[in-house]
Amino acid sequence: MKKPLILLAMVVALMILPFFINHGGEFGGSDGEAESQIQVVAPDYQPWFQPLYEPASGEIESLLFTLQGSLGAAVIFYILGYARGRQRRDDRV
């Protein structure tokens, strides 16, 4: 009974700790950080292509990113569940 509580406390600590370590810091995406570094290294750099769709706001962009991740997770876990069910069925025969 102690082990699950210790693991739960560790997970909660890992979730809360970043807020205290970087208090007042700004959270930004890796794309924006990469873009700023490219501008420092090569100010005359021109992108090879433009995005097919540019979301109207950051909230819509976050929504699309979340939907993409959720769909990917659903596909992966469906495949894992299907494979496990198939393996159990084959083990019974």
Swiss-Prot record:
It is a multi-pass membrane protein. Pathway: Cofactor biosynthesis; adenosylcobalamin biosynthesis. GO terms for molecular function: cobalt ion transmembrane transporter activity. One of its GO terms (biological process) is cobalamin biosynthetic process. It comes from the Bacteria. The chain crosses the membrane at residues 5-25, 63-83. Keywords: Cell inner membrane, Cell membrane, Cobalamin biosynthesis, Cobalt, Cobalt transport, Ion transport, Membrane, Transmembrane, Transmembrane helix, Transport. One of its GO terms (cellular component) is plasma membrane. It is found in: Cell inner membrane. InterPro entries: CbiN. It holds the Pfam family CbiN. Forms an energy-coupling factor (ECF) transporter complex composed of an ATP-binding protein (A component, CbiO), a transmembrane protein (T component, CbiQ) and 2 possible substrate-capture proteins (S components, CbiM and CbiN) of unknown stoichimetry. NCBIfam families: cbiN (TIGR01165), PRK02898.1 (NF002780). Belongs to the CbiN family. HAMAP family: CbiN. Part of the energy-coupling factor (ECF) transporter complex CbiMNOQ involved in cobalt import. This is Cobalt transport protein CbiN. It comes from Klebsiella pneumoniae (strain 342).
